[in-house]
Amino acid sequence: MLFTHRNPEMELDHKRTALVLVDMQNEFFEEKTGTYYELIADSLKERNVISHTEQLLKTAQELGYYILHSPHWYYPTDLQWVVPGGAIAHYLGGIGFCGRKDPVDLEGFAHSRADYYEPFKKYLMDGRTCNTSPHKHFGTMANDMVKQLRMRKVEKVIMAGPASNICLESHMRDLIEAGFEVAMVRDAVAGPKNEEGDGYVAAMVNWRFMANGLWTTEEAVNKMKAAATAA
């Protein structure tokens, strides 16, 4: 039996909706070897993810939507971990993924792999966007994303990010469990591949079952504009 059921369309409320982004960092978007970018380079280009992500950021900023961003950072003290990670965690630990010197000392941070992607800084560092504490493995359990959303009385989120089937999906699942309505933007995300298949396709299959909405960037932008006009 093929699952074809459709839930009622998710309706946006300007005051209760936020754009939630995950991993807006050089590690994922900057064209460098030896970084996560290599795993998703083709997927980023195929779906024009960088341009679509900026469209979402620009729209949310101009229309006054809350923007929340969950970065991925590791500090030298995280090397004290002795619990083994899975395949992707083990791999990333070996390539210096999203490494920072210290939570407070910013020496060496600017323009590093862990820094925000330069074209997005005008949105992420505008003084209004909330950059949460970092997530450590995949989801929100180690950061304050849910707290930040709750304190703004946000009920609905529009989500995007480069690691569709890993960090982004983990955030999505956590927010659904926490009681938020969630719409995923299908062409503002990327995914890596392994011998089992395509991570992007795996994410789309799961999101079709779980998310309240699965939209293109154009659809998301139009819905955000309509809700802002109606407010």
What are these language model-derived features?
Residues M1-A18, E27-F28, Q55, T59-L63, ...:
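Active-site-adjacent betaalpha module
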Residues K15-T17, K32-A60, G64-P71:
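A short alpha/beta connector and helix-capping loop motif
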Residues V22-D23:
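N-terminal nucleotide-binding beta1-loop-alpha1 segment
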Residues S70-W73, P162:
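Short, well-ordered beta-to-alpha junction loops that form the rim of enzyme active sites
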Residues Y75-L79:
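Short catalytic/ligand-binding loop motif for oxyanion handling, primarily in non-cytosolic enzymes
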